[in-house]
């Protein structure tokens, strides 16, 4: 019996001039999501999605590669200017911002939106190595 050929949905190129780059940098990973001004995702990438595993995932180089990958796909959608919001204490914060600038995107503003508790949850105990 003949198989029914699946029709693949093509990615529609959105013509977006400006957007927001959300950089979520934790101690274990860095996730870069580029959205339009309303918050609809245009492209995303992370260190883990690029094949970095274990301790290599939390390096600035992995964050740089994740930002470059997200920037390349957003440039295809016509993105030119970015506002950057950075969240978290990770090692890849500055590396990701520099990679976005190097990819040809103009960074207009950088905001730190790291959530700071008003003495909420107890933090995890200190590591003894």
Swiss-Prot record:
PROSITE patterns: RIBOSOMAL_S11. Signal peptide: none annotated. GO terms for cellular component: ribonucleoprotein complex; ribosome. GO terms for biological process: translation. Part of the 30S ribosomal subunit. Interacts with proteins S7 and S18. Binds to IF-3. The gene is rpsK. Gene3D superfamilies: Ribosomal protein S11. One of its GO terms (molecular function) is structural constituent of ribosome. This is Small ribosomal subunit protein uS11. Keywords: Ribonucleoprotein, Ribosomal protein, RNA-binding, rRNA-binding. NCBIfam families: PRK05309.1, uS11_bact. It comes from Lysinibacillus sphaericus (strain C3-41). Located on the platform of the 30S subunit, it bridges several disparate RNA helices of the 16S rRNA. Forms part of the Shine-Dalgarno cleft in the 70S ribosome. It holds the Pfam family Ribosomal_S11. It comes from the Bacteria. Belongs to the universal ribosomal protein uS11 family.
């Amino acid at each position: 019996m003949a198989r029914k050929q699946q029709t693949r949905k093509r990615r529609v190129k959105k013509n977006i001039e400006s957007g927001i780059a959300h950089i979520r940098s934790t101690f274990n990973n860095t996730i870069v999501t580029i959205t339009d001004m309303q918050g609809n995702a245009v492209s995303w990438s992370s260190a883990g999605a690029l094949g970095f595993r274990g301790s290599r995932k939390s390096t600035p180089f992995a964050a740089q590669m994740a930002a470059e990958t997200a920037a390349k796909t957003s440039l295809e959608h016509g993105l030119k200017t970015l506002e950057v919001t950075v969240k978290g204490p990770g090692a890849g914060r500055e590396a990701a911002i520099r990679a976005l600038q190097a990819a040809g995107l103009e960074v207009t503003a950088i905001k730190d939106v790291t959530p700071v508790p008003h003495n909420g949850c107890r933090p995890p105990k200190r590591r003894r190595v």
